Design a protein with these regions (language model features):
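Conserved AdoMet/S-adenosylmethionine-binding subsite of the radical SAM
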Residues: 63, 82-233
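Conserved Radical SAM active-site core
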Residues: 4-11, 23-24, 30, 35-115
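Flexible, acidic/Gly-rich N-terminal and inter-domain linker regions that tether
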Residues: 1-30, 34-38, 42-43, 201-203, ...
Length: 233
């Protein structure tokens, strides 16, 4: 029976992007070679934070949990989920008529069929060119006020005709963040959207404000490398 290393799986709602507010079952796989310095899910890869008990979940059991939740769709995330062969999981979910979304940096070949691809590029391992055209939406993490211009110079987002979300890196806008830096990040997003319009959109991780993921006891606490751990970011 096919198994996958799963850090956590839980029933919640999508807190960002086009599908904001819709019910979703999240499967967070274990492992990530990208190693973003501000990662909010370092428990999936960082040697100082990885749990002793990494679940090896059977595909059939995962699918059963998804179906029982009666969610609108499933989100496979990480870590970096595309380092795993997800073809068995996506096939089994599609047999149950469950739409499959994936959140990825796009740096590795896709193995599996996905109905929605959120591609969030990372400087530490840039996306494969072949994956850019597969994106249903992009998500740029805005670390500082120069981030957007740097990313637009690197990737011609506008040519793909899909939404490009501009998300403040969460620790940069936390209560403990430097106010000048925080204002610079948020202002850069607002000004870019006002100046350039579509496909750019101002984004936010609304689920963190609701603290909704923790309502499911199967959800692990976030392990961030920046921000305020007591508040989950």
């Amino acid at each position: 029976m096919k198994k996958l290393p799963v850090h956590e799986r839980f029933f919640t709602w999508q807190g960002e992007g086009v599908h904001l507010g819709r019910s979703a079952y999240f499967i967070r796989t274990f492992g990530c070679p990208v190693k973003c310095p501000w990662c909010d899910s370092a428990g999936t890869w960082h040697p100082d934070h990885t749990p002793k008990d990494v679940e090896k979940a059977e595909v059939d059991e995962l699918v059963s949990a998804v179906v029982q939740s009666n969610c609108d769709f499933v989100v496979i995330t990480g870590g970096e989920p595309t380092i795993h062969d997800l073809s068995h999981l996506t096939s089994a979910l599609h047999q149950e008529k469950v739409p499959v979304h994936i959140e990825t940096c796009g740096a590795f070949p896709f193995r599996g069929n996905f109905d929605w691809v959120t591609l969030s590029p990372k400087w530490w391992k840039l996306p494969l060119e072949e994956n850019l055209s597969k994106a249903s939406e992009f998500k740029i993490i805005v670390e500082d006020k120069s981030s957007i211009e740097k990313w637009v110079a690197e990737i011609p987002f506008a040519k793909f005709g899909v939404p490009v979300w501009l998300h403040p890196e969460w620790s940069s806008i936390s209560p403990t963040a430097n106010p000048e830096h925080k204002n610079g990040v948020l202002s850069s997003i607002s000004q870019w959207v006002k100046k350039n319009g579509s496909p750019y959109r101002a984004g936010y991780q609304l689920h963190k404000l609701y603290d909704v993921d923790r309502l499911d006891p199967n959800s692990r606490s976030l392990v961030p490398l920046g921000g305020d751990p007591s508040r989950g970011y």
